[in-house]
Amino acid sequence: MKRVVKFLMVVVAFAAAFSCAEPDLHPNPYLDVTANNIKGVWRMQSYDNGVQLAEGSYYYIVFDRAERSFVSYDNLGSMGQHTKSGKFDIVTDGAAVIFGDYDFGLGVNDWEHRYYVRNLTKDSMVWVAVDDEELVTVYVRDELPEWIEKRQ
C-alpha cells in the first residue's frame, strides 16, 4: 500500500511539474500606451499614410512623462526652425488616444487632431487621426541632434 501511495505521489508531482502551459512563443510585442512608454525623443519618419519627409526636412517631438509636456522641433513649411511646446494627455477608453495643446504664450491652441496610438514598441509608434484614418504618421525613437538643441 505504501508503494502505491508513493507511486501516486510521484505521478502527481511529475504531472504538476510537466503539465504547465507552454510559454507563449509569439508574445505581444506592443507596449501599453502610457506617458512612461512614450517619454523621450521621437522623429517623424512618414506622414499622410506613407509620405516620406523631403530631403533636409525634420520633425522631432520630445515627451516629458512627469510634466505631461512636449517640445517639438521642425522645419516643415518654412525655411527656419519652429519650436513649439505644450501639454499632452492620453486616454485609454478602448483605444489609446493622445491629444494635446500648444502654449503659444498668447493662449492655448488644441492640436489639429486627436490620434489613436497604435503599434507602440520601444522603437516606433503609429499615430492615426481619430477624425481621418487616412492621416497616418509613423514615429521612430531617436536622439535630438545637437544642432537642433543649439538653435532653440
Predicted regions and their residues:
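Lipid interaction determinants
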Residues: 21-85, 93-152
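Short beta-strand-centered aromatic/proline hotspots
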Residues: 88
